[in-house]
Amino acid sequence: DAKALAGIADAKLKHTETGDKSAPVIENVEIKKGDRNELLSGIKEGKELKKAETNDRSAPVIPADAKVQEDNRGALLADIQATAK
């Protein structure tokens, strides 16, 4: 709404100071740079993976003896048309 925003354009905002939170929270901690070449060589060597068992639950949960009833839509429409005449 233009009327509501008209007063905001002329408003003067107060100056505010923000705290620098980029420094580590834990004191006396050094962050070491990792050796990039060592990391890449480790990736290239590969790692033997453990065998994983999976539980495939993607199948629908419908009983095996479930039946789909016959579609009686045609008969219903015929009854409606017959009574409408």
Curated annotation (Swiss-Prot):
It holds the Pfam family WH2. GO terms for molecular function: actin binding. Residues 35-52 form the WH2 domain. InterPro entries: WH2_dom. Signal peptide: none annotated. Keywords: Actin-binding, Repeat. Is able to bind two actin monomers at high concentrations of G-actin. This is Actobindin homolog. It comes from Entamoeba histolytica.
